[in-house]
Regions:
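Conserved PLP-enzyme active-site core in the AAT-like
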Residues: 2-221
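Conserved C-terminal alpha-helix-loop-beta "cap" of PLP-dependent enzymes
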Residues: 220, 224-322
Length: 323
Protein backbone atom coordinates (compact mmCIF):
# COMPACT_ATOMS: atom_id res chain seq x y z
CA UNK A 1 0.00 0.00 0.00
CA UNK A 2 2.61 2.48 -1.10
CA UNK A 3 1.51 5.99 -2.05
CA UNK A 4 3.95 5.79 -4.97
CA UNK A 5 2.05 2.95 -6.65
CA UNK A 6 0.23 3.62 -9.90
CA UNK A 7 -3.00 2.15 -8.54
CA UNK A 8 -4.22 -0.03 -5.71
CA UNK A 9 -7.21 -2.28 -5.12
CA UNK A 10 -8.62 -4.19 -2.17
CA UNK A 11 -9.77 -7.81 -2.24
CA UNK A 12 -11.57 -9.98 0.28
CA UNK A 13 -9.26 -13.02 0.41
CA UNK A 14 -7.74 -15.18 3.17
CA UNK A 15 -4.16 -14.69 1.95
CA UNK A 16 -2.12 -13.36 -0.97
CA UNK A 17 -2.04 -16.50 -3.18
CA UNK A 18 -5.84 -16.66 -2.94
CA UNK A 19 -6.03 -12.97 -3.80
CA UNK A 20 -3.80 -13.39 -6.85
CA UNK A 21 -5.92 -16.31 -8.00
CA UNK A 22 -9.09 -14.31 -7.44
CA UNK A 23 -7.86 -11.54 -9.74
CA UNK A 24 -7.96 -13.95 -12.65
CA UNK A 25 -4.94 -12.39 -14.34
CA UNK A 26 -2.89 -15.62 -14.22
CA UNK A 27 -4.36 -17.46 -17.19
CA UNK A 28 -4.38 -21.09 -18.39
CA UNK A 29 -1.70 -20.41 -21.01
CA UNK A 30 0.64 -18.82 -18.44
CA UNK A 31 3.46 -20.22 -16.33
CA UNK A 32 3.72 -19.29 -12.65
CA UNK A 33 7.12 -19.80 -11.01
CA UNK A 34 7.01 -19.42 -7.22
CA UNK A 35 9.17 -19.79 -4.15
CA UNK A 36 6.66 -20.56 -1.42
CA UNK A 37 7.60 -23.86 0.20
CA UNK A 38 5.40 -23.07 3.22
CA UNK A 39 2.35 -22.40 1.00
CA UNK A 40 2.47 -25.30 -1.46
CA UNK A 41 -1.20 -26.25 -1.06
CA UNK A 42 -2.38 -22.72 -1.88
CA UNK A 43 -0.58 -22.80 -5.21
CA UNK A 44 -1.64 -26.36 -5.99
CA UNK A 45 -5.33 -25.59 -5.47
CA UNK A 46 -5.51 -21.96 -6.54
CA UNK A 47 -3.72 -22.14 -9.88
CA UNK A 48 -4.58 -25.57 -11.25
CA UNK A 49 -5.54 -23.91 -14.54
CA UNK A 50 -1.96 -22.97 -15.42
CA UNK A 51 1.57 -24.36 -15.39
CA UNK A 52 2.91 -23.94 -11.84
CA UNK A 53 6.60 -24.49 -11.07
CA UNK A 54 7.67 -24.35 -7.42
CA UNK A 55 11.38 -23.67 -7.00
CA UNK A 56 13.52 -24.65 -4.03
CA UNK A 57 15.48 -21.42 -3.82
CA UNK A 58 14.50 -17.72 -4.04
CA UNK A 59 17.48 -16.99 -6.31
CA UNK A 60 17.28 -15.42 -9.76
CA UNK A 61 19.12 -18.45 -11.13
CA UNK A 62 16.46 -20.87 -9.85
CA UNK A 63 13.67 -18.78 -11.34
CA UNK A 64 15.45 -18.45 -14.68
CA UNK A 65 16.03 -22.21 -14.84
CA UNK A 66 12.34 -22.92 -14.14
CA UNK A 67 11.37 -20.49 -16.90
CA UNK A 68 13.44 -22.03 -19.67
CA UNK A 69 11.55 -22.93 -22.82
CA UNK A 70 8.60 -20.64 -22.09
CA UNK A 71 8.04 -17.96 -24.72
CA UNK A 72 6.77 -15.10 -22.54
CA UNK A 73 5.43 -11.76 -23.67
CA UNK A 74 4.63 -8.39 -22.10
CA UNK A 75 1.73 -7.98 -24.54
CA UNK A 76 -1.64 -7.97 -22.82
CA UNK A 77 -2.68 -11.05 -24.80
CA UNK A 78 0.19 -13.11 -23.40
CA UNK A 79 1.21 -15.78 -22.77
CA UNK A 80 2.64 -14.46 -19.51
CA UNK A 81 5.40 -15.69 -17.26
CA UNK A 82 4.92 -14.88 -13.56
CA UNK A 83 7.59 -14.90 -10.86
CA UNK A 84 6.29 -14.94 -7.26
CA UNK A 85 8.24 -14.50 -4.02
CA UNK A 86 7.67 -13.16 -0.51
CA UNK A 87 9.79 -10.23 0.65
CA UNK A 88 10.13 -12.34 3.83
CA UNK A 89 8.82 -15.88 3.61
CA UNK A 90 9.17 -19.58 3.05
CA UNK A 91 10.63 -21.97 5.59
CA UNK A 92 13.53 -20.21 7.25
CA UNK A 93 12.05 -16.74 6.64
CA UNK A 94 14.09 -16.24 3.50
CA UNK A 95 14.71 -12.74 2.12
CA UNK A 96 15.19 -12.82 -1.66
CA UNK A 97 17.38 -10.32 -3.46
CA UNK A 98 14.45 -8.43 -4.97
CA UNK A 99 16.71 -6.17 -7.03
CA UNK A 100 18.41 -9.11 -8.73
CA UNK A 101 15.10 -10.90 -9.23
CA UNK A 102 13.50 -7.77 -10.66
CA UNK A 103 16.29 -7.35 -13.21
CA UNK A 104 16.28 -11.03 -14.15
CA UNK A 105 12.48 -11.07 -14.42
CA UNK A 106 12.50 -8.28 -16.97
CA UNK A 107 15.23 -10.01 -18.96
CA UNK A 108 13.04 -13.14 -19.03
CA UNK A 109 9.91 -11.09 -19.84
CA UNK A 110 8.43 -12.20 -16.51
CA UNK A 111 5.92 -10.29 -14.41
CA UNK A 112 7.50 -10.05 -10.96
CA UNK A 113 5.01 -10.38 -8.08
CA UNK A 114 5.96 -9.86 -4.43
CA UNK A 115 3.92 -10.94 -1.42
CA UNK A 116 4.80 -8.18 1.03
CA UNK A 117 2.64 -9.38 3.91
CA UNK A 118 5.28 -10.18 6.53
CA UNK A 119 7.54 -7.19 5.93
CA UNK A 120 4.64 -4.85 5.02
CA UNK A 121 4.99 -1.68 3.00
CA UNK A 122 6.60 -0.16 6.10
CA UNK A 123 9.38 -2.72 6.05
CA UNK A 124 9.96 -3.19 2.31
CA UNK A 125 9.33 -0.99 -0.73
CA UNK A 126 9.04 -3.93 -3.10
CA UNK A 127 8.06 -1.88 -6.14
CA UNK A 128 11.07 0.40 -5.82
CA UNK A 129 13.16 -2.78 -5.77
CA UNK A 130 11.62 -4.20 -8.94
CA UNK A 131 8.17 -5.71 -8.33
CA UNK A 132 5.62 -5.03 -11.05
CA UNK A 133 2.83 -6.13 -8.74
CA UNK A 134 2.79 -6.13 -4.94
CA UNK A 135 0.19 -7.82 -2.75
CA UNK A 136 -0.17 -7.58 1.01
CA UNK A 137 -2.59 -9.21 3.43
CA UNK A 138 -3.77 -6.45 5.76
CA UNK A 139 -4.03 -8.28 9.11
CA UNK A 140 -1.17 -6.31 10.62
CA UNK A 141 -2.12 -3.06 8.87
CA UNK A 142 -5.56 -3.36 10.51
CA UNK A 143 -3.96 -4.26 13.88
CA UNK A 144 -5.84 -7.57 13.88
CA UNK A 145 -9.21 -5.79 14.08
CA UNK A 146 -10.58 -6.27 10.54
CA UNK A 147 -13.92 -8.15 10.47
CA UNK A 148 -12.80 -10.06 7.35
CA UNK A 149 -9.51 -10.88 5.66
CA UNK A 150 -8.38 -8.19 3.22
CA UNK A 151 -5.58 -8.15 0.65
CA UNK A 152 -4.23 -5.00 -1.02
CA UNK A 153 -2.99 -5.15 -4.63
CA UNK A 154 -0.81 -2.37 -6.01
CA UNK A 155 0.77 -1.89 -9.43
CA UNK A 156 4.14 -0.21 -9.95
CA UNK A 157 4.38 2.99 -11.94
CA UNK A 158 5.39 2.31 -15.52
CA UNK A 159 7.16 5.64 -16.10
CA UNK A 160 10.89 5.28 -15.47
CA UNK A 161 13.69 7.84 -15.61
CA UNK A 162 14.38 9.63 -18.89
CA UNK A 163 10.86 8.97 -20.15
CA UNK A 164 11.44 5.21 -20.44
CA UNK A 165 8.45 2.94 -19.92
CA UNK A 166 8.61 -0.19 -17.76
CA UNK A 167 6.95 -2.76 -20.02
CA UNK A 168 6.36 -5.18 -17.13
CA UNK A 169 4.52 -2.59 -15.03
CA UNK A 170 2.53 -1.46 -18.07
CA UNK A 171 1.51 -5.06 -18.77
CA UNK A 172 0.52 -5.63 -15.12
CA UNK A 173 -1.60 -2.46 -15.22
CA UNK A 174 -3.35 -3.56 -18.42
CA UNK A 175 -4.09 -7.00 -16.99
CA UNK A 176 -5.46 -5.60 -13.74
CA UNK A 177 -7.53 -3.02 -15.59
CA UNK A 178 -8.96 -5.69 -17.87
CA UNK A 179 -9.75 -8.30 -15.23
CA UNK A 180 -13.20 -6.81 -14.63
CA UNK A 181 -13.03 -7.14 -10.86
CA UNK A 182 -15.68 -5.06 -9.12
CA UNK A 183 -14.51 -2.52 -6.54
CA UNK A 184 -14.68 -3.98 -3.05
CA UNK A 185 -17.23 -2.17 -0.91
CA UNK A 186 -16.05 -1.78 2.67
CA UNK A 187 -18.47 -1.47 5.54
CA UNK A 188 -18.18 1.65 7.71
CA UNK A 189 -16.55 -0.49 10.39
CA UNK A 190 -13.98 -1.91 7.96
CA UNK A 191 -13.17 1.53 6.57
CA UNK A 192 -12.70 2.88 10.09
CA UNK A 193 -10.43 -0.01 11.10
CA UNK A 194 -8.32 0.48 7.98
CA UNK A 195 -8.06 4.25 8.44
CA UNK A 196 -7.05 3.93 12.09
CA UNK A 197 -4.57 1.22 11.21
CA UNK A 198 -2.90 3.34 8.55
CA UNK A 199 -2.74 6.34 10.91
CA UNK A 200 -0.85 4.32 13.54
CA UNK A 201 1.02 2.03 11.14
CA UNK A 202 4.57 3.33 11.42
CA UNK A 203 4.63 3.37 15.23
CA UNK A 204 3.03 -0.08 15.52
CA UNK A 205 5.17 -1.72 12.86
CA UNK A 206 8.35 -0.36 14.42
CA UNK A 207 7.21 -1.87 17.72
CA UNK A 208 6.56 -5.26 16.05
CA UNK A 209 10.02 -5.17 14.42
CA UNK A 210 11.84 -4.12 17.60
CA UNK A 211 10.17 -6.81 19.69
CA UNK A 212 10.93 -9.46 17.09
CA UNK A 213 14.61 -8.55 17.28
CA UNK A 214 14.57 -8.78 21.09
CA UNK A 215 12.84 -12.17 21.03
CA UNK A 216 15.17 -13.47 18.31
CA UNK A 217 18.19 -12.57 20.42
CA UNK A 218 16.62 -14.25 23.46
CA UNK A 219 15.88 -17.43 21.48
CA UNK A 220 19.32 -17.48 19.86
CA UNK A 221 20.85 -17.62 23.34
CA UNK A 222 18.38 -20.22 24.63
CA UNK A 223 19.77 -23.76 24.87
CA UNK A 224 16.26 -25.25 24.85
CA UNK A 225 15.68 -24.38 21.16
CA UNK A 226 17.82 -24.54 18.05
CA UNK A 227 18.12 -23.22 14.50
CA UNK A 228 16.75 -19.75 15.19
CA UNK A 229 15.95 -18.04 11.90
CA UNK A 230 15.55 -14.26 11.83
CA UNK A 231 16.92 -12.05 9.03
CA UNK A 232 18.48 -9.69 11.57
CA UNK A 233 20.80 -12.38 12.96
CA UNK A 234 24.21 -12.69 11.30
CA UNK A 235 23.65 -16.48 11.21
CA UNK A 236 20.72 -16.10 8.80
CA UNK A 237 21.69 -17.08 5.22
CA UNK A 238 20.13 -13.91 3.80
CA UNK A 239 21.32 -11.47 6.46
CA UNK A 240 23.58 -9.50 4.11
CA UNK A 241 20.84 -9.30 1.46
CA UNK A 242 18.23 -8.33 4.05
CA UNK A 243 20.21 -5.27 5.13
CA UNK A 244 19.72 -3.82 1.64
CA UNK A 245 16.16 -5.03 1.04
CA UNK A 246 14.33 -4.46 4.34
CA UNK A 247 13.75 -1.13 6.06
CA UNK A 248 13.36 -0.11 9.73
CA UNK A 249 14.58 -3.50 10.92
CA UNK A 250 14.13 -7.10 9.82
CA UNK A 251 10.42 -7.78 10.08
CA UNK A 252 8.12 -9.07 12.83
CA UNK A 253 8.73 -12.83 12.46
CA UNK A 254 11.12 -15.30 14.07
CA UNK A 255 11.33 -19.03 13.36
CA UNK A 256 12.95 -21.73 15.50
CA UNK A 257 12.95 -25.48 16.10
CA UNK A 258 12.14 -27.33 19.29
CA UNK A 259 14.47 -30.05 20.55
CA UNK A 260 12.80 -33.47 20.68
CA UNK A 261 9.38 -31.90 21.24
CA UNK A 262 6.51 -31.10 18.88
CA UNK A 263 4.87 -27.77 18.19
CA UNK A 264 1.61 -29.11 19.59
CA UNK A 265 3.28 -29.95 22.90
CA UNK A 266 4.60 -26.39 23.22
CA UNK A 267 1.19 -24.95 22.40
CA UNK A 268 -0.36 -27.08 25.16
CA UNK A 269 2.16 -25.66 27.63
CA UNK A 270 1.45 -22.02 26.69
CA UNK A 271 -1.47 -19.73 27.50
CA UNK A 272 -4.14 -19.96 24.81
CA UNK A 273 -3.77 -16.36 23.61
CA UNK A 274 -0.46 -17.24 21.95
CA UNK A 275 -2.50 -19.27 19.46
CA UNK A 276 -5.94 -17.65 19.48
CA UNK A 277 -5.09 -13.94 19.41
CA UNK A 278 -5.93 -12.16 16.13
CA UNK A 279 -3.28 -12.32 13.41
CA UNK A 280 -1.54 -8.96 13.18
CA UNK A 281 -2.74 -7.81 16.59
CA UNK A 282 -0.99 -6.61 19.72
CA UNK A 283 -0.42 -10.07 21.24
CA UNK A 284 2.56 -12.17 20.13
CA UNK A 285 1.26 -15.14 18.15
CA UNK A 286 2.77 -18.56 17.42
CA UNK A 287 2.04 -20.90 14.52
CA UNK A 288 3.28 -24.28 13.34
CA UNK A 289 4.24 -24.01 9.65
CA UNK A 290 5.11 -27.73 9.53
CA UNK A 291 2.02 -28.80 11.47
CA UNK A 292 1.56 -29.58 15.16
CA UNK A 293 3.46 -32.86 14.82
CA UNK A 294 6.50 -31.03 13.47
CA UNK A 295 8.98 -29.16 15.61
CA UNK A 296 9.10 -25.79 13.83
CA UNK A 297 7.62 -22.71 15.49
CA UNK A 298 6.98 -19.40 13.75
CA UNK A 299 6.58 -16.43 16.08
CA UNK A 300 5.01 -13.15 15.03
CA UNK A 301 5.93 -10.50 17.57
CA UNK A 302 3.11 -8.34 18.85
CA UNK A 303 3.45 -4.99 20.58
CA UNK A 304 3.33 -6.63 24.00
CA UNK A 305 6.27 -6.62 26.42
CA UNK A 306 9.00 -8.89 24.98
CA UNK A 307 10.36 -9.56 28.48
CA UNK A 308 7.00 -10.97 29.53
CA UNK A 309 6.74 -13.01 26.31
CA UNK A 310 10.26 -14.38 26.81
CA UNK A 311 9.46 -15.31 30.41
CA UNK A 312 6.28 -17.17 29.41
CA UNK A 313 8.13 -18.98 26.61
CA UNK A 314 10.96 -19.87 28.98
CA UNK A 315 8.56 -21.35 31.53
CA UNK A 316 6.80 -23.40 28.85
CA UNK A 317 10.10 -24.70 27.44
CA UNK A 318 11.30 -25.67 30.92
CA UNK A 319 8.03 -27.46 31.55
CA UNK A 320 8.49 -29.44 28.32
CA UNK A 321 12.03 -30.35 29.33
CA UNK A 322 10.74 -32.06 32.50
CA UNK A 323 8.14 -34.21 30.72
Amino acid sequence: MRTGAREAQLLAAPHVPAGLSQLGIVRPCDRLVAFADDFVDAFASGFDCCDVALVGSPSAEAFAAASEGFDASFDAEGPHLWWFVNSIGGFGLRVPDLRALGRAAREAHALFVVDNTVASAFGCDSQRLGAALSLEALDRICAGDAPRKLVAVSVARSQLKRHRVDAAAECAHALLEGCGLAKLELTANEAGVLDRGLDSLDVRMQAHFDRARALAEYLAANEMVRNVRYPGLSSHPDHAIATGILEHGFGPAVEFDLIERSSGELFDALPGEFRTSPAGGATTRLSAPSGKQGNTIRLFAGTDDPLVVASVLDNALRKLATL
